[in-house]
């Protein structure tokens, strides 16, 4: 492992429509095979559908959905004397957002709706109401961390 310098976090350009870095990151996570314009159109269409259903603005609705999926703790495997323990650790804010976005995209891809924009809109709507696959994933992670609270002293 090189020891020269610490590589900083790359600055992401905000998205063109709402000038939000969070939304730009979400578009990048949704993107497949470098098709960014397709990813942008899917996200913007999904946000339009979401705004029609709720009384919130585009970014407020997206932020509300993301807030309900963000994990606060997760477990990491730690080997201590021949046995592996699942040690609960706090999640850093950047990783919190990344995990939430990844879970929402994965849950949307697994849905059976017609278009990806509709699937994404439905998943975001479910996340706003604290239901759906992405929220369930977050709750499962929290439950696992809670169950392994006894091993918290193995933190590093």
Curated annotation (Swiss-Prot):
Gene Ontology BP annotations: translation
Gene Ontology cellular component annotations, sorted alphabetically: small ribosomal subunit
InterPro entries: Ribosomal_uS7 (IPR000235), Ribosomal_uS7_bac/org-type (IPR005717), Ribosomal_uS7_CS (IPR020606), Ribosomal_uS7_dom (IPR023798), Ribosomal_uS7_dom_sf (IPR036823)
Claim: tRNA-binding is one of the keywords in the record: yes
Keywords assigned: Ribonucleoprotein, Ribosomal protein, RNA-binding, rRNA-binding, tRNA-binding
Highest rank taxon of the organism: Bacteria
UniProt xrefs under Pfam families: Ribosomal_S7
Keyword Protein transport: no
UniProt GO MF annotations: rRNA binding; structural constituent of ribosome; tRNA binding
Subunit text: Part of the 30S ribosomal subunit. Contacts proteins S9 and S11.
NCBIfam families: rpsG_bact
Family: Belongs to the universal ribosomal protein uS7 family.
Function description: One of the primary rRNA binding proteins, it binds directly to 16S rRNA where it nucleates assembly of the head domain of the 30S subunit. Is located at the subunit interface close to the decoding center, probably blocks exit of the E-site tRNA.
Name of the molecule in the record: Small ribosomal subunit protein uS7
Protein source organism: Hamiltonella defensa subsp. Acyrthosiphon pisum (strain 5AT)
Gene: rpsG
């Amino acid at each position: 492992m090189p020891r020269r310098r610490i590589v900083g976090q790359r600055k992401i350009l905000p998205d063109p429509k709402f000038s939000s870095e969070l939304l730009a990151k979400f578009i990048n996570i949704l993107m497949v095979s470098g098709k960014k314009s397709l990813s942008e159109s899917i996200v913007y269409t999904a946000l339009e559908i979401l705004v029609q259903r709720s009384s919130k603005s585009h970014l407020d609705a997206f932020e509300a959905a993301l807030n309900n999926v963000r994990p606060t703790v997760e477990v990491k495997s730690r080997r201590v004397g021949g046995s592996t323990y699942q040690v609960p650790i706090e999640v850093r804010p950047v990783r919190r957002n990344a995990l939430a976005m990844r879970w929402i995209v994965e849950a949307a891809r697994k849905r059976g709706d017609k278009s990806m924009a509709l699937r994404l809109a439905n998943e975001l709507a479910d996340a706003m109401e604290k239901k759906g696959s992405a929220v369930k994933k977050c709750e499962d992670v929290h439950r696992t961390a809670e169950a392994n609270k006894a091993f918290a002293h193995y933190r590093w």
